[in-house]
Structures are given as C-alpha cells and as structure tokens.
Amino acid sequence: MASGVGAACEELPPDGTCDECEPDEAPGAEEVCRDCGFCYCRRHADAHRQKFLSHRLAAYVHGAQAWTPPASGGDDALPEDAEAKGEAEGEVESEVGEEESETEVDSESEEESETEEDSEDESDEESEEDSEEEMEDEQESEAEEDNQEEGESEAEGETEAESEFDPEIEMEAERVAKRKCPDHGLDLSTYCQEDRQLICVLCPVIGAHRGHQLSTLDEAFEELRSKDSGGLKAAMIELVERLKFKSSDPKVTRDQMKIFIQQEFKKVQKVIADEEQKALHLVDIQEAMATAHVTEILADIQSHMDRLMTQMAQAKEQLDTSNESAEPKAEGDEEGPSGASEEEDT
C-alpha cells in the first residue's frame, strides 16, 4: 500500500493546500505526513496525528518531497521501520503528554485567576454594600435631623402665627380698646345723652362733650332698656296696611308702586337701624358697667392690700422698738448679779 501511495504522490504533486478541506475553501498547507504524503492544515493535521499515531508529520515546505518511501532491504528493513515507528510513536506520546500537562497547568492557572477575581469581586461588592449602607445611614440621620428642625420651626411658626392671628386675642384687644377713651385713654364710665355715646370723665371737661347732658352708666342702661321696643312691630303693621291700600287703587301704575315700596322699606330700615343702635348701646353700656364694676372691685382689693401693708409695717416698727427697749434691761440684769457678788466678796 505504501508503494501505491507513493506512486499516487509522484503522479499528483502537492499544490500547497490542505487535502482534507474542500478544494474551493482549502487553506494553505502547514504540515505534511511523511508516511502517506498528504498535506494538512492545522486542524486536520491534529486530527490526523491523533488518528494515526505512527505517522510522521512535519512542517510543509513548498517544493520539497512530501512522501518519504520506506527503505527496501527485506528483513533488515523491518527492524529499522519498527524502530522508526516506535520513535515516532514515543515522540507523539511525549508531545501529547506535554500538551495535556500544558492544558492542565493553563486550566489550573485560569481557575486560580478566576477564584482570585471572584474573591476580589466579592470583596469589592461587600465594600460597596458597606459604603452604601453607611451612606444610607448618614442620609437617614440627616433626614431625621432636618425633620426635627422643620418640626421645631413649624411649631415655632405655628405658635407665632397663633399668637399673631388668634381671633380671640384680636377680639380681646378690640374689646380693651373699646373700653378706653380714644382721646384720653381712660375708662368709659359716663354716657352722653345728646350724642348717645360712652365717654370718659375728661370728655365733658376738656373734650368735645362740654355742656352736654350726661348720665351714669346705670341710668343710661335702665333708660334704654325701659324704652318700648314695639316701634319695629308697629312699623311693619303700618307697612302692610299701606301696601294693601296702594295695591287696591287701580290708578296706581307699576312704576308708582315700585317707588312706594322703596320709600316704605326705607322707613322700616331706619327703624331697624335705630333698634340695632339701641341694642349695641345696651351691650356697650353693660360691658362698660362690668368693667367699671371690676375696676371698683380691684380698687377695693388694692386699698385693702395697702391697709394691710401699712398695718404690717406698723407692727414691724412696734416689734423693733420693743426689742430695742428690751436689750438695755437685759444688760442691766446681767450687771446687777455681778455687782452684788463683788460686794459680798469685799
């Protein structure tokens, strides 16, 4: 068979491409088999080497003889061929062992590098997680501080707003201002009958109410309360009767009826305004009376406290004087027994 292969190789010299690949897609030959004479690329050379362990592969050189015929010589040639085959097989096995050891070393080094990279990645991830947790804790603490500050500022703002815009405080301030005379700043303790207004004690003396008829708060309150409040009721009854009479007159036009209604309601509105003013006067007078009453009570309490303070001061002075008078007597008593003892000794 070797002779047949050699004859084929002599008839068909190698063209420099891989004999196993497709002719149209065959790459350049890199190795050649010395036993069978075929040229191979890198991939097919490795496959041929693994399949035929006894074949000898060498680097392909263009123009060189690809096939080396076996030496003829009968029985003498057989040992040489066996030795050559054994050497080739040993070389192939050694090459395969070296390749396997290299692949094992490479795989071990790759595994070690992968484990190192994994450990580094894990440490990096842990450090990143720790840093993220620290950042989150810091952000939470900052947010809590900001919330506390905002709550305090809001509470302060609410208290300030309540103190500034509390309607009860404003109403109380208005009441206090109404209880004082706008001209003199004194309590409103007198009532002007002509102007129907509360005034202080200085208004009829040096103010705008000089020469006016005055009355006390109690008198003004009783007078306003005793007045008949049936004026509004009488005005309403009179309005209804006039409207009936006017509407029954066929000579009255619609425009005249509108004018009449407006005039009558103006009269009723005036009566209502008078009643409203009367009620407001009653409230103001009653409030002024309460203020005056409270003022009188406070004045009585203050005078009583002044009397008590005076009595306490007098009692303290008497106690001090009695203590001062008692001190010389005690000194005389102490000197008396000592002088008597001295006389007895003499």
From Swiss-Prot:
Region (Disordered): 68-167, 313-346
Gene3D superfamilies, sorted: 4.10.830.40, Classic Zinc Finger (3.30.160.60)
UniProt zinc finger (B box-type) residues: 176-217
Lineage summary: Eukaryota, Metazoa, Chordata, Craniata, Vertebrata
Protein name from the UniProt record: Tripartite motif-containing protein 44
SUPFAM superfamilies for this protein: B-box zinc-binding domain
Functional description taken from the UniProt entry: May play a role in the process of differentiation and maturation of neuronal cells. May regulate the activity of TRIM17. Is a negative regulator of PAX6 expression.
Residues the entry annotates as binding Zn(2+): 181, 184, 203, 209
Tissues expressing the protein: Expressed mainly in brain with high level in cerebral hemispheres and cerebellum. Lower expression in kidney, lung and spleen. In brain is detected in the hippocampus, thalamic and pretectal nuclei, substantia nigra, the dorsal part of the medulla, the cerebellum, in the olfactory nucleus, other cortical areas apart from hippocampus and the striatum. Indeed expression is confined in neuronal somata namely in the CA3 region and dentate gyrus of the hippocampus, caudate-putamen, parabranchial nucleus, olfactory nucleus, cortex, deep cerebellar nuclei and thalamus.
Subunit structure: Interacts (via coiled coil) with TRIM17 (via coiled coil).
Biased composition annotated in UniProt, kind: Acidic residues: 89-167, 332-346
Signal peptide: none
Molecular-function annotations in GO: zinc ion binding
Record keywords: Coiled coil, Metal-binding, Phosphoprotein, Zinc, Zinc-finger
InterPro entries: TRIM/RBCC (IPR050143), Znf_B-box (IPR000315)
Superkingdom per UniProt: Eukaryota
Coiled-coil portions: 292-327
PTM-bearing positions, type Phosphoserine: 338, 341
